[in-house]
């Protein structure tokens, strides 16, 4: 807590002193301070909220002699404002009135009852339905980094030990945390400054012993050996900081966080940050979801299934046994035609994973219980369908999903069919669930019958025809008589209120009944809230089994989704083998084929130990990048258990996928396009193995022709000779097509085009051999370059080709692609001019001068 100078506090009003004290306890957050029907913000908080939320900035009197900046928002609209703030990385402390204004001397007692941060959300209205909501922490050691993530909305807690900055960058790209904690000593700020929701934390929160003790306390264990993480020192320090932060913000027990998992990179195909970005797995290059692999594949029935699919896409497996179990399950659902039936059943489950987290945190609302009841009611039908399945994975999932008849019966008996949003005003517990509650409700709800009976009885006893019995919130129950008949009222009537033309009375009997009814309403509500709390106690012992059910249902959802996609999009089951190589027959790009207005041209690829590098040439827009990406995407899809867009596919082991495709300046780090390109190339050359899949596109284009060709040649040569990685190397340097003649394992393939007059038609079909032309000018014309510029370029190209043909007769036997020539084109007559500058005319004989004139003419023509 930030200390406050007591002398400074004395300058302010009592209310403002209360505010400043609470703000000092939460200096890094916006403080929503409850004032009647509004939340108010003051000083810098008010200015920031006004800017971020577009609300009016005003002033609220003076305190300490200066106007106080103030902004306010209605309490009933707070959830919408909170959603906006957490989406941009802001945290909020919500301060409520907890005292009674009627009995308070001075400011009403207030307390921070809720802290909302981007990484600790559980409220359904604030969460992104189809995305994990991860809180993360980084700790930097002398060698390497510790990284931990926690999804409080599911309880999933994962740590990773990372050796390099590149590995950390890849993890940040894979997990995309919405809030990130880092220590005061963290030095690689350029890695995280672009992220939203970064929080600097004191070094003591990362203390190793403190972290271990926090985790042991949370898990209720004597040591961490059972989790296999005892040696993960750096990541345990990060995990400890996470636990401290969550405990500070949630202010409640966290029983659903009862395990921690170590992420082992060796279990999955490693994808660096550039590869995840270039392949557009779950996020396109513009930051959206459209036209990504997830956009094509995600036809899941539940939000939790959608989130699991995205995790799978970022973590393709290497264990062929697990992969095969998924493929076989998908195949069975297709063969038995069960995927659609299961999809419809799963659709009604909702987001059980997040409901269970809210139950564990005791923040669930009545409708969460109703949704859980609905989900449990569907399990017998779901189990009947799964009973037709025989594959081991589907059988295992059926066992984990299970059935919960006792819990379903409890919720059926306890919760009304359509409960209100909040327990606050009651009406949640079903009649018949608890006899005492029914009695108190009967007293309250039976008032109408009693008042009708009392009115009839009093009319008869008094003979007053205008007598009525009524109720209002200010005066309670009353007997109303017209003033003309007021002289007939019995002495037992006590005047309560005089109105124009009427008098209102209370009787001892009515007074007793009033107290009884009002008391019954309060007691009914208090008892209902007590029964509500007991429901948590009755459900939570089954928390672990219910979480297993949610996780298994999500996995079943993804498997059903794979089956539906395979059937609808004509995917085929890949064959996973132990021999290195990739053989794909008639492969298709899963995204491009879905968005293309024309039929997609399928293409093969064949990579193995004797053919591990393909030099890919062809025109711009001919499909080189699409071809390379589809090889990577098909391989990745196979490794997550999905069928693939191809007639057939045989996929061997892959340890990493690298992509060096496209580039842009990294202005934040001061790196040029070429520097980014070379950094990514260096990463590939240092880390690729013979089991890596490498996509290299246009290496060397960001520098001079000679430098670029030299770098491209050397990189390709090193990949082919030393690493022997499975490589697709696209280039416009035609000289690289000579590599297959010099290096075993390298081969040429190309994508061709047909030229007619000034137009060009791209064939998009991959063929063996090198391309003969790049069609650069034709593509420029298609791009809208002015025709006079194209004509000038053709003239210049003709001059350069003529020069190169004369200067390089030795390569006439090679396929000609002069637009790819390395030789820098000299200015016309440059050689003749250079020759002239070396001549001394006074020393030439007439015969020498004549010979020199012919030579200069010849040079000028060249």
Curated annotation (Swiss-Prot):
Residues 806-824 have a biased composition (Low complexity). SUPFAM superfamilies: DNA repair protein MutS, domain I (SSF55271), DNA repair protein MutS, domain II (SSF53150), DNA repair protein MutS, domain III (SSF48334), P-loop containing nucleoside triphosphate hydrolases (SSF52540). GO terms for molecular function: ATP binding; ATP-dependent DNA damage sensor activity; damaged DNA binding; mismatched DNA binding. Keywords: ATP-binding, DNA damage, DNA repair, DNA-binding, Nucleotide-binding. ATP binds at residues 618-625. GO terms for cellular component: cytosol. Residues 799-824 are annotated as: Disordered. The keyword Transmembrane does not apply. It comes from the Bacteria. One of its GO terms (biological process) is mismatch repair. It holds the Pfam family MutS_II. Belongs to the DNA mismatch repair MutS family. This protein is involved in the repair of mismatches in DNA. It is possible that it carries out the mismatch recognition step. This protein has a weak ATPase activity. HAMAP family: MutS. This is DNA mismatch repair protein MutS. It comes from Shewanella denitrificans (strain OS217 / ATCC BAA-1090 / DSM 15013). The gene is mutS.
């Amino acid at each position: 807590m930030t200390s406050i100078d007591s002398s400074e506090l004395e300058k302010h009003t009592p209310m403002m002193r209360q505010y400043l004290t609470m703000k000092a306890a939460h200096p890094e957050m916006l403080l929503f301070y409850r004032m009647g029907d509004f939340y108010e913000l003051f000083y810098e908080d008010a200015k920031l909220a006004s800017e971020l939320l577009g609300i009016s900035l005003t002033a609220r009197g003076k305190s300490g002699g200066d106007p106080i900046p103030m902004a306010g928002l209605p309490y009933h609209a707070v959830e919408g404002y909170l959603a906006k703030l957490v989406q941009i990385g802001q945290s909020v402390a919500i301060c409520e009135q907890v005292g009674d204004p009627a009995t308070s001397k001075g400011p009403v007692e207030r307390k921070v009852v809720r802290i909302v941060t981007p990484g600790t959300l559980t409220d359904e209205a604030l969460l992104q339905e189809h995305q994990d909501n991860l809180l993360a922490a980084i700790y930097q050691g002398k060698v390497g980094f510790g990284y931990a993530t926690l999804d409080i909305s599911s309880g999933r807690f994962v740590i990773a030990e990372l050796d390099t900055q590149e590995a950390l960058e890849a993890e940040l790209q894979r997990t995309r945390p919405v809030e990130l904690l880092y220590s005061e000593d963290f030095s690689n700020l350029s890695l995280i400054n672009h992220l939203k929701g970064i929080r600097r934390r004191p070094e003591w929160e990362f203390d190793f012993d403190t972290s271990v003790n926090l985790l042991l306390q949370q898990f209720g264990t004597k040591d961490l050996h059972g989790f296999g993480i005892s040696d993960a020192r750096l990541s345990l320090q990060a995990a400890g900081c996470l636990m401290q932060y969550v405990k500070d913000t949630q202010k409640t027990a966290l029983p659903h966080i009862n395990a921690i998992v170590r992420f082992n990179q060796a279990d999955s195909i490693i994808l660096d940050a550039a590869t995840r970005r270039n392949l557009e797995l779950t996020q396109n290059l513009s930051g959206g979801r459209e036209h990504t692999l997830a956009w094509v594949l995600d036809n899941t029935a539940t939000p939790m299934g959608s989130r699991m699919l995205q995790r799978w896409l970022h973590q393709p497996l290497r264990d062929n046994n697990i992969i095969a179990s998924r493929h076989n399950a998908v195949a069975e659902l297709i063969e038995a035609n069960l995927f659609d039936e299961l999809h419809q059943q799963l659709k009604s489950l909702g987001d059980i994973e997040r409901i269970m987290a809210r139950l564990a945190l005791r923040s669930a609302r009545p409708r969460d219980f109703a949704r859980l009841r609905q989900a449990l009611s569907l399990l017998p039908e779901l189990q009947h369908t799964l009973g037709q399945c025989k594959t081991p994975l589907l059988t295992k999932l059926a066992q984990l999903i299970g059935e919960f008849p006792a819990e379903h019966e409890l919720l059926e008996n306890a919760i009304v069919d359509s409960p209100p949003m909040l327990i606050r005003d009651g009406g949640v517990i079903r009649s018949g669930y608890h006899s005492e509650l029914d009695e108190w409700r009967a007293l309250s709800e039976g008032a109408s019958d009693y008042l009708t009976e009392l009115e009839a009885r009093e009319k008869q006893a008094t003979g007053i025809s205008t007598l009525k019995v009524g109720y209002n919130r200010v005066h309670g129950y009353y007997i109303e008589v017209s003033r003309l008949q007021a002289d007939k009222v019995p002495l037992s009537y006590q005047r309560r209120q005089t109105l124009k033309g009427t008098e209102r009375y209370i009787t001892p009997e009515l007074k007793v009944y009033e107290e009884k009814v009002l008391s019954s309403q309060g007691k009914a509500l208090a008892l209902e809230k007590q029964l509500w709390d007991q429901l948590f106690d009755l459900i939570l012992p089954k928390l672990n089994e219910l979480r297993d059910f949610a996780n298994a249902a999500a996995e079943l959802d993804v498997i059903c989704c794979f089956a539906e996609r395979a059937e609808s999009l004509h995917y085929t089951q890949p064959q996973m083998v132990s021999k290195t190589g990739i053989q794909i027959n008639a492969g298709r790009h899963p995204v491009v084929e879905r968005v293309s207005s024309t039929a997609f041209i399928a293409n093969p690829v064949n990579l193995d130990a004797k053919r591990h590098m393909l030099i890919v040439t062809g025109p711009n827009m001919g499909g080189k990048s699409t071809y390379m990406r589809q090889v990577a995407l098909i391989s990745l899809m196979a490794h997550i258990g999905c069928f693939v867009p191809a007639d057939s596919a045989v996929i061997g082991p892959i340890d990493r996928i690298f992509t060096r495709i496209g580039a842009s300046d990294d202005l934040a780090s001061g790196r040029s396009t070429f520097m980014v390109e070379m950094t990514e190339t260096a990463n590939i050359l240092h880390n690729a193995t013979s089991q890596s899949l490498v996509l290299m596109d246009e290496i060397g284009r960001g520098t001079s022709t000679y430098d670029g060709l030299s770098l491209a040649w050397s990189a390709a040569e090193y990949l082919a000779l030393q690493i022997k990685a499975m490589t697709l190397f696209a280039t416009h340097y035609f000289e690289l097509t000579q590599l297959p003649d010099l290096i075993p394992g390298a081969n040429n393939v190309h994508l061709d085009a047909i030229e007619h007059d000034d137009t060009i038609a791209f064939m998009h079909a991959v063929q063996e051999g090198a391309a003969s032309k790049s069609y650069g000018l034709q593509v420029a014309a298609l791009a809208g370059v002015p025709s006079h510029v194209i004509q000038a370029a053709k003239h210049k190209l003709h001059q350069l080709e003529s020069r190169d043909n004369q200067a390089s007769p030795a390569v006439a036997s090679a396929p000609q692609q002069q637009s790819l020539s390395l030789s820098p084109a000299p200015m016309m007559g440059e050689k003749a001019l250079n020759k002239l500058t070396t001549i001394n005319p006074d020393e030439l004989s007439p015969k020498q001068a004549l010979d020199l004139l012919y030579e200069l003419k010849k040079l000028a023509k060249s």
